[in-house]
Amino acid sequence: MKGGNYTSLGTCSGINVSGNVAGTRKMSLGKSIKMYLTIFILTTCIYMALYQYHISREPFAASEVVKHQEKSSSYIASYLWSPISLLMANSSSNTNNNSTTTSTTTTTAPTTPTTTTTTTVGSVGQKLGASSISSIRMVSLAATIPSFKSTLSESRSVSLGGHQKTATVKTSTTITTRTTASGLATTKLSATTRTTAKTSAKLSAATTPTASHMENGYKTRPTFVAASLPPPLYIITPTYRRPEQLAELTRLGYTLKHVVNLLWLVIEDANKTNPLVGHTLDRIGVPYEYMVAPMPEKYKQTKKAKPRGVSNRNRGLEYLREHATEGVLYFADDDNTYDISIFEQMRYISKVAMWPVGLVTKTGVSSPIIQAGKLVGYYDGWIGGRKYPVDMAGFAVSVKFLKERPNAQMPFKPGYEEDGFLRSLAPLDDAEIELLADECRDILTWHTQTKKNAPAQALNRTRYKNTNLEHIDRLLVRP
C-alpha cells in the first residue's frame, strides 16, 4: 500500500513539473516575439527617419524645364511597408533613371534653337500656302497625358527658329523630339524654273509608356507641344550678270538664312539660268526659286536710263499671284544691307508698311515723316513729283492685299518704279500704311552699293594647265 501511494505521488509530481516547464517555455516564446516585434518596429522607424533625412538633404534642380512626377498609392506603400526598399532607394532610383524615367537637359541659346539637321535636295511641284505650313516649334507648356501628336504638311518643308529661349529634352519613355532649322518648299513653275529645297524636318516621338514605367506608377507629363509657323515671307531679288553677282548673292543669302519661314525668289535679267548662280544658291541653303525674266528689247536699246529690275520684280509678282495665298512680299536688292529684325516686323502687316532707308541721296536717308504717330509726308533727296518718294528697300506689301489688286505691277519708268507700284495698289490711304522700325525712328535697311569691278582677264591656260586656277576660273562671272 505504501509503495502504491509512493508511486501515485511521484506521478503527480512529474505532471506538475512538466506543466511548469511548458508554461515557462510559452512565456519565454511570448517575450521573444514581443522583443523581435519591438526591434522590427524600431528598425523600421529608424530606416524611415534616415530616408526622410536623406530626401531632405537632396537639392532641388533649378531648371527652366520641370518634369513633374506623381507617385501612385502602390508606389508610396512599397516604401512604407518595406524597410528593404528604403535601403535600396538610391540604387533602384539610379536604375530607373537609366531605364524608364525622364532625363532633362536644358540649353538656352540667344538666337537659335538646338537642332539636328537632315538635308534633302529636290523639287516640289506643289503650291506654297502658308495656311497649310506647319512646324514643331518648342514651347514650354504643360500637358496632361504622356503622348505627343504632330503632323507635317504634305511635301512642304518647315522651319524652326526665332529669337527665343529653347530647351532640348530627351525622354526615354515619353517623347524624343528632334527638329531642324529649315525653310519652305518651293514650287517648280516652268522649264526655266529651277527649284531646290535644302532642308526638311524630322520628327520622332515615342507615344506609349513602357511596361515597367506603368508598373512603377509614374505619370510623366510632357512639357512641349506643337506650334504653327509665323506668316511666310517672300523675298524678291532681281539680279544680273556681273563680276560682283555671286559675292552679293552670298552676302544677302546668309542674311536671309537667319530668317524662318522664308522663300527667296531670285530672278535674273537673262534668257537662261546661270549654273554658277544655282550652285551658289545651293551652297547657301536658303529655300529659293531661281527664275529668269529678261528686260524687253525696246528698253535694252534705249540710250536713256534703263528700268533695271522691273521685269524681274513683275515676274516675282506673277509667281506670288499663282502660288502664294498669304504672307508678305518684299523687294530686296542683292547689294543692300539688312538688319534681320526688319523681317520679323514686316511679316505681320495687314496691307502696306514703310520704314526709313539709310544711305539714300544727299540727305543720307529716305523716310516717311511721322508727327504725333501719323504719316504727314516724306523725306527724300529727290521728290520728283512722286506721291510715294520712298526707296525700294523701304516698304513691304501683304500678299493678300496684292492679290485683291490683280492689275498692280511695277512700271518700266526709271526713277518712278516704287511710286508707280504703290500707286497701282490703290485704293490705299495713308492711315492704312503701317509704320515699322519704331515708328520710323530707327534705320534697319541701307542702300549700300558695291564698288564696280572690271571683268577678270582671261586665264593663260597653257601656263597654268593642271593647276587649281583652272577650277577657280570657272567660278568667275564675266559679262
UniProtKB/Swiss-Prot annotation:
PROSITE patterns from the UniProt entry: PHOSPHOPANTETHEINE (PS00012)
Listed GO biological process terms: carbohydrate metabolic process; chondroitin sulfate proteoglycan biosynthetic process; core 1 O-glycan biosynthetic process; glycoprotein biosynthetic process; glycosphingolipid biosynthetic process; protein N-linked glycosylation; proteoglycan biosynthetic process
Keywords, ordered alphabetically: Glycoprotein, Golgi apparatus, Manganese, Membrane, Metal-binding, Signal-anchor, Transferase, Transmembrane, Transmembrane helix
Binding-site residues for Mn(2+), renumbered to this chain: D335
Positions of region (Disordered): 94-122
Organism: Drosophila melanogaster (Fruit fly)
Gene name, Swiss-Prot/TrEMBL: GlcAT-P
Residue stretches spanning the membrane: 35-50
Family per similarity comment: Belongs to the glycosyltransferase 43 family.
Glycosylated residues (UniProt): N90, N97, N98, N271, N460
Ranges per topology, Cytoplasmic: 1-34
Cofactor(s) named in the record: Mn(2+)
Biased composition (Low complexity): 94-120
Pathway(s) served: Protein modification; protein glycosylation
Pfam family, one: Glyco_transf_43
Sample GO molecular function, one term: N-acetyllactosamine beta-1,3-glucuronosyltransferase activity
Annotated catalytic residues: E418 (proton acceptor)
Name under which the protein is recorded: Galactosylgalactosylxylosylprotein 3-beta-glucuronosyltransferase P
Sequence ranges on the Lumenal membrane side: 51-479
Role noted for this protein: Involved in the biosynthesis of L2/HNK-1 carbohydrate epitope on both glycolipids and glycoproteins. Enzyme has a broad specificity.
Cellular compartment(s): Golgi apparatus membrane
